[in-house]
Amino acid sequence: MTKGILGKKLGMTQVFAVDGKCIPVTVVEAGPCVVLQKKTEEKDGYNALQLGFGAKKTQSVNKPAMGHFKKSGKGAFEFLREVECENIDDHAVGDEITCDGFFATGDVIDVTGTSKGKGFQGVIKRWNFAGGRASHGSMFHRRPGGIGASAWPSRVFKGKKMAGQMGNKRVTTQGLEVVDVRPEKSLVLIKGAVPGPVNGLLLIRKSRKV
C-alpha cells in the first residue's frame, strides 16, 4: 500500500459527534489517484509510485507529457507527485488509488500543503513582535527595533527575524484525526484546519509519530 494519497481542500464545516459535541472539520476530496509510473529499488534505488490527480484538458499538454500520460490510459492530470510504497508489486500502471481502504475513522494523519500567501509583511504580523507604545509621545510603533550591535559583531546575524514574504510555503500539519470517510464521494473529513487555500493540493500520509 502507498504511504500517501493526493487530495484537494474543499473547505471547512462542522459535524456533531454522538455525544452532541460540535467538531470543526476540513472537507478534503482525497483521490481517486492514478498510478502513472513505478519506481523500483532495482532500477531507481527506491520504491515509490508516481500518482496523477485532477483531470486536465489534453489540449494544454505538450507531446512528451502526453506520451507519459498515455501509458496509464486514463487521460492527462494536473498534479503529479511521488509517494512512498512498501509493496510495489501490488500496483500496476493505470491502477486507481481511492480513499476507501486507505482511511478509517479515528486514523491519525499528516497533511502537507502550500500555505496561503500573505505578501510582504512587517515583523508584527510575520513574527508576532510586540511593537512599541501606541501613544504618550512614542515614535516607535510597528518597527523591528535594533537588528544588530555597533562595534561588535558589526553585522546582522543570519536568520534574524525581519519583514519579508509571508506564507506561500510548504507546510505540514501533524497529528490530525480522521473524523469520517465518505468513499462514495471520495471525501474525507479531517478534524481541525489543514494548510492552504480552498482547492489547494494536499498530500495526506499516515502519521509518522504514531
Curated annotation (Swiss-Prot):
The keyword RNA-binding applies. GO terms for molecular function: rRNA binding; structural constituent of ribosome. One of its GO terms (biological process) is translation. InterPro entries: Ribosomal_uL3 (IPR000597), Ribosomal_uL3_bac/org-type (IPR019927), Ribosomal_uL3_CS (IPR019926), Transl_B-barrel_sf (IPR009000). Pfam families: Ribosomal_L3. Keywords: Ribonucleoprotein, Ribosomal protein, RNA-binding, rRNA-binding. It comes from the Bacteria. The keyword Isomerase does not apply. One of its GO terms (cellular component) is cytosolic large ribosomal subunit. Belongs to the universal ribosomal protein uL3 family. Part of the 50S ribosomal subunit. Forms a cluster with proteins L14 and L19. One of the primary rRNA binding proteins, it binds directly near the 3'-end of the 23S rRNA, where it nucleates assembly of the 50S subunit. This is Large ribosomal subunit protein uL3. It comes from Syntrophotalea carbinolica (strain DSM 2380 / NBRC 103641 / GraBd1) (Pelobacter carbinolicus).
